[in-house]
Amino acid sequence: MIRPQTFKAILVFVANDISGGEDDRTPGEVLKLYRILVRQIRVRNPDTPVFWIETTPTPSRWHATGRIRTANRKIRRYCDRNPDLYFIGTHEAFTGPEGTPDSTLFRSDMLHLNRDGYRLWAELIKQSLSEEGILP
């Protein structure tokens, strides 16, 4: 899965496991898949920090936000309890004062980020990597 290389960090972003469809995974299944991924990463990269980027709230999947937030909470707890696992929060940055997704950060499909959305997303990632000493 991951070739023998030295990484400063590994970033993981998953957004399609819970989309509001019939075939959605449960929050528990999403956590289980992440734990499997981490075990696979650890085989060749035992000390490399792994950063989970929170599944970003989107207007088009807002109807599934309860399950998405539950999965995010489970993964945050897992990261908090394990060394070299980090959780990059995005929810607060992508929601407005009413607590719903800020539609100005998304393309017309209200699922994918636009330029401003990606700029904000990149800032959150860079900030976390800097806080952990990965980036200057």
Language-model segments: which ranges?
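Alpha-helical cap/lid subdomain in secreted, periplasmic
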Residues: M1-P136
